[in-house]
Amino acid sequence: VRSRLLAVVFAALLIATPMAGVAGAQESQEDGPEWPTPPEADSAYVTDDGDVVLVYEQETESPTGGTVETANFGLDVGEGVAHALFVQNMTSASETTGEFTTVLDPDRIAANGSLATPSPDALSSFSLNADLVQSDTEANADFSLEAGIDESAGVGGFVESADLENELRVGPDRLTADGQLSFSTGFGAGTEQSQSFTVTEDDSGYTLDAAQNRPVYSYSVDNWNTRSAAEQTITQNYGSLATQLGGEASVTLESYSFSNATDSYADGMLDVEFTVEYTGIDDGLSEQVATMLASSEQYDLTQSEAETVGEQIAEMQINEASVSTSTGDGANEYSYSADVENYDGALRAYYTVLQSASMPAGTSLPASYNASFERIQQTLDAQQESGMVQTFTLDGSVSQADSGTDVTLNAGYETENWEAYRQALADRGIDLATSEMTLQAGLDGDEITADGSVTVQQDELVSNMLRSVTSTTENGSDVSRLAQAFEDAGFQRARTDISVSDGQVQMEAGASFRNMQQLASVYQELSGAESLPSTIVGEQNSSDSSTVYMRLSGAVSADATEEDVRALEPVGEDTEVSLAGEYDRTFPSVDVENAYDYLNIDRSTGTDTSEGSQPGFGVAVALVALAGAAFLARRE
């Protein structure tokens, strides 16, 4: 019974949660979630106007690590508001302090907060900065981290130094990438060896240039211990690809040396350079891809469509692709580079194949599946039209200092022609959100302090989230109906505040709707309940008892008999029934005015009363449900 009470309060508060249906977005009508209904009450009171107040009372235990000072929540369907407050005193004082505020509006989601927590003893210095902007005219991001780690942490004993450099540049027709990683471990064991491979393409075909200086072990000595054996091995290993694709390969052994090994594990050292020239493999690749896709039961493509995919893949131009490694005596170096043109067609081919994937018998794709691929194609078209270029960078280093180890990490994101790209998307009916994020953290004495904020804004942000739920579920499914009801309920605002200080944790949350009854009515249909509470109030002002009141408006007549009351589903054999006029007890109501004040909304007009913008982040009102659930969980 207690678990059912927990479930129904949680569900009732979820009525006020903007993403109530997301968790079950893939549920079908037959396998949909089971919607909880009010459990059997401890007592039931009939009011003079025929309402029935269900009362649930339970002794509670103090939560681990603290005592409850205040825990109360309320939901008023008629007023369209939900509010919760939870305050816990911790038995052992925490040195961590922080404040976080979150707000969700129909067109905006935002957050800010600050935190201070004791620094680890091994951290001698620390700073972190992150900034992100995506607006109508620009999109960029920067991240930097610097930290000094005391030698007592033992990091320097494994890594003496390290350097990392990476850049990826993605344009409408060309993609380039370069990167390298080098590090020294301080361990000198191991044979020095290196390998490098570079592929280039021209009108005649592909060329592979390779160099290897590495140990050879007993199981493969016969493949490499003579020049002719090495040439035959290279032809077999690298020329077979051309044969498979109906082309030809020509191998040239530029240099060759096989000598005694420098360690006791290897049987020889190979030092070789060779070139492999491939011709006629593009057509073979295109034909093999087309044949495989057209004959596969996994993909629903005609022969013509499969051939188009194969041609698009073959049209990709590899100007250069290379990788190299060098290790030995504790030093390690790795690098790569790529320069590819006409990749757009191959990317579109990839999405075409994904879109054609067949579903197993008895399953179906969500309604938005094809629409998602159409949006991808439109995005690629917009990138082509605008010439938008994105550049990603990632650099870092590890070095040793007198006091220990210094670590740095930097990441960046930049765009070119972003404004034209957004306009090209807008011309295709795609509206991108604007967003801004900042985060700063550093070492302040013996503490790490941090401050941050994030804001995301888009017209009909919440409505778009709900439409994504309905579009990814079956028409008429429970989740789809609930998501649609949520949109019809006229969501106004959700807010959450969390603070930790002086050994106390406080969480407050709230949400408001213009017509919550719309959502409650659909939930009642889905759950099959005779009736749902019009209000729910929970109170716990100590750590040893809690009470929840659920009011069923107009459930019976004012002169109802006990038999009439016991006919209600939540009134069981053990429920104590008190008819109108038989008791002297009052029941708490939801403090609606306080809830609206907390949300900074004028109760009569439903307009914003806050000064300036409210910070916020995430689906804030979900914490209203969390507060109610946590409150009742102590009954367990």
Which residue ranges define each predicted feature?
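Hydrophobic alpha-helical segments
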Residues: 1-29, 604-636
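Extracellular/lumenal glycan-associated context and N-glycosylation machinery
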Residues: 26-606
